[in-house]
């Protein structure tokens, strides 16, 4: 049981670090804006004054200009990636408990909704909601595991000896019913 809690904690911390890194990248794009500094490989004083003392114009930018992606599209793309990661986390947690799966799925949807606002604040809200949700999922998962370890494996009402809560559910069946939001908005 300790190993499961430890693994869940490592997964949750890794996901939060990833979310905070993405939010930091996004906030840098929003706050700094585009910076266009040409670089020719020569020091500035040699570029301005030629070898014989004549004045030469600055060299044009040799980099190929890439079309800039609007901030809202970048935010939508990052939100979609985060949603898919949380959904994958929900499916992994769902191997242990249906309630934990539903809670993690709700966390993923809330995170997507908050991140869809295309603001740094939205990402911060999503990160905080994901952190709280993952801690809650971890606690529920720990409670489910402790309940399973203390209960008997044979239920009086079941004909084959499995309790209703111990019936295995295939992750493919569960994933088929999860709606994926429309990211084109």
From Swiss-Prot:
Keywords linked to the UniProt accession: Glycoprotein, Signal
- The entry annotates sugar attachment on 18
- Composition bias (Basic and acidic residues) maps to 43-66
Q: Indicate the principal place this protein occupies in or around the cell.
A: other
The residues that cross the membrane are none
- Output the superkingdom of the source species: Eukaryota
Q: What is this protein called?
A: Dense granule protein 2
Say which species the protein is native to: Toxoplasma gondii
Gene encoding this chain?
GRA2
């Amino acid at each position: 049981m300790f190993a499961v809690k430890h693994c869940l904690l490592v997964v949750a911390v890794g996901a939060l670090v990833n979310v905070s890194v993405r939010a930091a990248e996004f906030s840098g794009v929003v706050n700094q804006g585009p910076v266009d500094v040409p670089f020719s490989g020569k020091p500035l004083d040699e570029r301005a004054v030629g070898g014989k003392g004549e004045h030469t114009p600055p060299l044009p930018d040799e980099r190929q200009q890439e079309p800039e992606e609007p901030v809202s599209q970048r935010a939508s793309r990052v939100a979609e990636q985060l949603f898919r990661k949380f959904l994958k986390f929900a499916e992994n947690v769902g191997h242990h408990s249906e309630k934990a799966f539903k809670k993690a799925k709700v966390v993923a949807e809330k995170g997507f909704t908050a991140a869809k606002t295309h603001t740094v604040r939205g990402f911060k809200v999503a990160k905080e909601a994901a952190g709280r949700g993952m801690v809650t999922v971890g606690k529920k998962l720990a409670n489910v595991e402790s309940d399973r370890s203390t209960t008997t494996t044979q239920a009086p009402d079941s004909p084959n000896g499995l309790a209703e809560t111990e019936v295995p559910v295939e992750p493919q069946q569960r994933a088929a019913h999860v709606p994926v939001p429309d990211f084109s908005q």
